[in-house]
C-alpha cells in the first residue's frame, strides 16, 4: 500500500511543484510540506485542506502524459485528457485520503451520489438511419467507439420505445478511456430509459472482469432507473475470449470479439440485416435462459415490501446497518399501533405482515446470527418529536414519530432480545453523519440497499460475489465497533442509560 508521503512526492514530481508553491496554496509553512513528504507529518484531517491540495494538483495536470501517469498510479482508466479538472480533483482527493475503490464502496457511494451525477442533455443525432441489410466491420478501440455511437443513434431515432438486449463481457476500457464519449453514451442510455426502453443485460461475475468498479460507476445510474434487468451466468467458463453484444430487435445488432489479454485485436460488427438481428436475438434468449438475476432497482416504495419479506424469511447469517431502529426489533404493541395508525394506507398491509412474522423472526434467532446495526437518536431528538418510526425520514414514514414512551418501549425490546437470544447482536451507531442508505445482507443469497433520501431507490442484489463484498463491508464495520463479549455488556449499559434519560 502506497503511503501518503509517497503519493504526495509522486504528485509533486509529475507536476513539478516545489514545497514553497504547495505551501502557498495551503497557507502553511514550506517546512510543513517537507515533513509531509518525508512521512513525519500526516495528511490534514480538515476536508477543505485535502480538497484544496487535490484541486491544486488536478489543475497542474492537463497534459496527456500526466493524465496517463495518474491513470496508472490510481488504477483508473477513465483518467484521460478529456476528464474535467473537477472530476480529476475528486479522484485525487479520495486517493490521497486512502479511500478504497472496492465494489462495496463503489455501490454505496454511487447510490448516494445519484442526484449529483452530471447528466448533460443528450445531443440528438442528425445522421440518417443506417440502410437495411447492411453489415459493416470495424477494428480496434476506435472501431468499437464508432459502432457504439452508431448503435446509440439508431436507438435514439426509434419513434416507439423498444427492448435492448446486451451482453457485456469486457471491462469497458475502450469506452471509459474517453471521458466525453463515456458521458455521452451514459446520458443516451438514461434518456432511453426515461422514454420507456427496457434493457436486459447479461454481465460477468466479479472475478471475470477487470476495472469492475469503474464499469459499475458507469452502469449504476442507469440501473437506478429501474428500466434495466441484470443477469449473470453462474457457471465457470473459459476466459480466453471476451465479447459484447447489443441487439435491438427489429432494428440492428452490434457484436464484438477479442482476445481477453488486450484490445488491439478487437473486431466489431454492425448490422441491420433482419435475419442477422433475429439470429442474435434468438441467441440472446438462449443465453439468458441459463442465467440468474443479478440486480434489480425499484423506485416505488410500495415495491420494497416483497423484497424485505423475502430477506427476513431467509435462513443463514444476516447483518444490517440502518438509519433508524429496525422493524425486526420492534415490540408487538408498537407494531399494533403502527397498524392502527396506518389505517387503509399502503403501509397497513406491510405492518400486518411484519406483526405476523414476529414469532418466525425470533425462532430464526435460535439458529443463526443476526447483527443489527442502528443509529441511535439522542434523548433531545426523541423529545423533539422528529424521529420517524421504522423509516429514514418523516416524508417516507408519513405519519408516526417516536415519543419518549414509544422509543423506550423499542429499546426495552432490544434489551429483551439480547438477553433471550445469544444470536442477536445490537450495535448502536452514533456518528453524527449518517449515510444516505440502509444496507441489509443475507449470507450468500440477497442484499438490499435502500437510498434514504429522495429519490428513494431500492437495489436488489443477487450475485453472490457482490453480496459477499457487501457482507464483508458490514462485518468490517461491526468488528470496528465490537459486538461480542464485553462489548455486548457495554451496549446494554448504553441502552439502559438512554432509557433512564428518557424517563422510561
What kind of region is each of these model predictions?
Residues 1-17:
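A short, Lys/Arg-rich alpha-helix, primarily the initiator
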Residues 27-44, 72:
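Recognition helix of helix-turn-helix/homeodomain-like DNA-binding domains
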Residues 129-501:
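Hydrophobic protein-protein interaction segments
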Residues 12, 23, 54:
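The alpha-helix within a helix-turn-helix
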Residues 47-64:
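DNA major-groove recognition helix of helix-turn-helix/homeodomain DNA-binding modules
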Residues 12, 37, 57:
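DNA major-groove recognition helix of helix-turn-helix
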Residues 62-138, 149-153:
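Helix-turn-helix/homeodomain-like alpha-helical modules used for DNA recognition
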Residues 18-24:
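Short alpha-helical "recognition helix" segments of helix-turn-helix
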Amino acid at each position: 500500500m502506497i503511503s501518503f508521503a509517497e503519493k504526495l512526492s509522486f504528485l509533486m514530481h509529475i507536476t513539478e511543484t516545489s514545497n514553497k508553491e504547495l505551501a502557498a496554496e495551503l497557507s502553511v509553512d514550506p517546512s510543513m510540506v517537507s515533513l509531509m513528504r518525508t512521512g513525519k507529518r500526516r495528511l490534514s484531517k480538515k476536508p477543505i485542506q485535502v480538497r484544496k491540495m487535490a484541486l491544486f494538483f488536478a489543475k497542474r495536470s492537463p497534459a496527456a502524459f500526466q493524465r496517463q501517469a495518474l491513470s496508472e498510479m490510481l488504477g483508473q482508466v477513465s483518467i484521460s485528457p478529456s476528464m474535467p479538472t473537477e472530476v480529476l480533483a475528486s479522484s485525487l482527493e479520495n486517493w490521497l485520503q486512502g479511500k478504497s475503490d472496492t465494489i462495496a464502496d463503489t455501490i454505496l457511494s454511487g447510490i448516494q451520489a445519484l442526484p449529483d451525477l452530471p447528466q448533460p442533455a443528450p445531443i440528438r443525432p442528425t445522421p440518417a438511419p443506417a440502410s437495411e441489410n447492411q453489415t459493416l466491420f470495424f477494428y480496434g478501440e476506435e472501431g468499437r467507439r464508432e459502432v457504439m455511437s452508431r448503435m446509440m443513434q439508431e436507438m435514439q431515432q426509434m419513434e416507439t420505445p423498444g427492448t435492448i438486449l446486451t451482453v457485456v463481457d469486457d471491462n469497458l476500457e475502450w469506452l471509459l478511456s474517453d471521458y466525453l464519449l463515456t458521458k455521452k453514451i451514459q446520458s443516451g442510455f438514461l434518456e432511453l430509459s426515461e422514454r420507456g426502453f427496457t434493457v436486459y443485460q447479461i454481465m460477468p461475475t466479479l472475478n471475470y472482469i477487470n476495472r469492475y468498479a469503474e464499469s459499475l460507476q458507469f452502469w449504476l445510474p442507469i440501473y437506478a432507473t429501474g428500466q434495466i434487468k441484470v443477469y449473470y451466468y453462474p457457471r465457470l467458463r473459459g476466459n480466453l475470449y471476451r465479447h459484447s453484444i447489443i441487439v435491438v430487435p427489429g432494428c440492428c445488432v452490434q457484436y464484438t470479439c477479442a482476445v481477453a489479454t488486450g484490445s488491439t485485436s478487437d473486431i466489431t460488427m454492425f448490422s441491420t440485416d433482419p435475419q442477422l438481428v433475429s439470429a442474435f436475438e434468438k441467441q440472446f434468449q438462449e443465453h439468458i435462459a441459463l442465467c440468474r438475476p443479478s440486480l434489480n432497482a425499484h423506485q416505488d416504495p410500495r415495491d420494497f415490501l416483497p423484497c424485505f419479506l423475502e430477506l427476513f424469511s431467509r435462513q443463514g447469517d444476516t447483518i444490517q446497518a440502518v438509519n433508524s431502529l429496525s422493524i425486526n426489533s420492534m415490540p408487538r404493541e408498537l407494531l399494533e399501533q403502527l397498524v392502527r395508525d396506518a389505517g387503509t394506507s399502503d403501509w397497513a398491509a406491510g405492518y400486518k405482515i411484519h406483526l405476523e412474522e414476529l414469532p418466525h423472526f425470533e425462532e430464526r434467532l435460535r439458529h443463526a446470527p443476526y447483527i443489527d446495526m442502528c443509529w441511535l437518536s439522542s434523548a433531545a431528538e426523541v423529545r423533539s418529536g422528529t424521529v420517524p418510526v421504522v423509516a429514514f425520514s418523516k416524508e417516507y414514514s408519513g405519519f408516526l414519530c417516536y415519543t419518549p414512551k414509544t422509543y423506550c418501549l423499542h429499546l426495552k425490546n432490544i434489551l429483551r432480545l439480547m438477553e433471550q437470544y445469544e444470536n442477536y447482536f445490537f450495535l448502536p451507531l452514533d456518528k453524527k453523519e449518517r449515510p444516505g442508505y440502509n444496507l441489509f445482507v443475507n449470507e450468500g443469497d440477497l442484499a438490499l440497499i435502500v437510498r434514504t433520501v429522495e429519490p428513494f431507490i431500492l437495489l436488489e442484489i443477487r450475485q453472490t460475489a457482490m453480496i459477499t463484498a457487501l457482507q464483508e463491508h458490514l462485518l468490517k464495520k461491526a468488528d470496528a465497533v465490537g459486538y461480542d463479549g464485553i462489548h455486548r455488556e457495554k451496549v446494554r449499559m448504553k441502552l439502559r442509560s438512554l432509557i433512564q434519560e428518557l424517563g422510561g
